[in-house]
């Protein structure tokens, strides 16, 4: 995505235009790095939670703890899978744009990317919040409702879930930063869309 939105006019200086292009390239490189990190963290989070299983024998009865037992963890896995796939596609687009040196001129496409980033960011925040609340209940219990501390029996399961939530949190922070960058990029297009009129003396 291009973040310049500044056309070359008779009043623009070539040096200034070159400087703006360098700034634009740095922003796009930053976006590429962030999207790659989000993809990695989201994928790790989904794998950690989805593969987390622990079996305990209680009074000769085997009890298995898995992520599907908690709807919040299922939601977290699905959301992080979506975030990883979306970030991978956008990272590839950023890389291709950098290699070709092309800029995004289509405002509808810029808005589509903006709304996509916003949606994924909000979903990531919701997923982490729901999973963190469920994890807190599993760790601390709820004496008033006679909810026991599940993590006292399934320590390994809870530890791996905690690692998954931590990885999802990093992915969430990255998506929030990316959504800010895409918002800046969209509104930057409109900020420089009108050519400057030369003043008359």
UniProtKB/Swiss-Prot annotation:
<keyword id="KW-0472">Membrane</keyword>
<comment type="similarity">
    <text>Belongs to the Casparian strip membrane proteins (CASP) family.</text>
</comment>
<dbReference type="Pfam" id="PF04535">
    <property type="entry name" value="CASP_dom"/>
</dbReference>
<keyword id="KW-1003">Cell membrane</keyword>
<feature type="transmembrane region" description="Helical">
    <location>
        <begin position="109"/>
        <end position="129"/>
    </location>
</feature>
<keyword id="KW-1133">Transmembrane helix</keyword>
<protein>
    <recommendedName>
        <fullName>CASP-like protein 2B2</fullName>
    </recommendedName>
</protein>
<feature type="topological domain" description="Cytoplasmic">
    <location>
        <begin position="1"/>
        <end position="28"/>
    </location>
</feature>
<keyword id="KW-0812">Transmembrane</keyword>
<dbReference type="InterPro" id="IPR006702">
    <property type="entry name" value="CASP_dom"/>
</dbReference>
<feature type="transmembrane region" description="Helical">
    <location>
        <begin position="72"/>
        <end position="92"/>
    </location>
</feature>
<dbReference type="GO" id="GO:0005886">
    <property type="term" value="C:plasma membrane"/>
</dbReference>
<dbReference type="InterPro" id="IPR006459">
    <property type="entry name" value="CASP/CASPL"/>
</dbReference>
<feature type="transmembrane region" description="Helical">
    <location>
        <begin position="167"/>
        <end position="187"/>
    </location>
</feature>
<feature type="topological domain" description="Cytoplasmic">
    <location>
        <begin position="93"/>
        <end position="108"/>
    </location>
</feature>
<feature type="topological domain" description="Extracellular">
    <location>
        <begin position="130"/>
        <end position="166"/>
    </location>
</feature>
<feature type="topological domain" description="Cytoplasmic">
    <location>
        <begin position="188"/>
        <end position="201"/>
    </location>
</feature>
<feature type="topological domain" description="Extracellular">
    <location>
        <begin position="50"/>
        <end position="71"/>
    </location>
</feature>
<feature type="transmembrane region" description="Helical">
    <location>
        <begin position="29"/>
        <end position="49"/>
    </location>
</feature>
<comment type="subunit">
    <text>Homodimer and heterodimers.</text>
</comment>
């Amino acid at each position: 995505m291009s973040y310049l939105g500044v056309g070359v006019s008779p009043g623009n200086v070539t040096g200034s235009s070159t400087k703006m292009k360098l700034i634009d390239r740095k922003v796009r490189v930053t976006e590429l790095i962030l999207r790659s990190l989000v993809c990695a963290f989201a994928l790790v989070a989904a794998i950690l939670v989805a593969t987390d299983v622990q079996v305990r024998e209680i009074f000769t009865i085997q009890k298995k703890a898995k992520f599907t037992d908690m709807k919040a963890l299922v939601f977290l896995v699905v959301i992080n899978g979506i975030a990883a796939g979306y970030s991978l596609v956008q990272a590839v687009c950023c890389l291709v744009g950098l290699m070709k040196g092309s800029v995004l001129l289509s405002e509808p496409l810029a808005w589509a990317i903006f709304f996509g980033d916003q949606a994924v960011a909000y979903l990531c925040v919701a997923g982490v919040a729901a999973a963190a609340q469920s994890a807190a209940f599993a760790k601390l219990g709820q004496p008033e409702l006679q909810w026991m501390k599940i993590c006292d029996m399934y320590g390994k399961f809870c530890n791996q879930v905690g690692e998954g939530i931590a990885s999802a949190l990093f992915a969430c922070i990255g998506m929030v930063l990316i959504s800010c960058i895409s918002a800046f990029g969209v509104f930057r297009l409109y900020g420089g869309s009108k050519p400057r009129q030369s003043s008359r003396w």
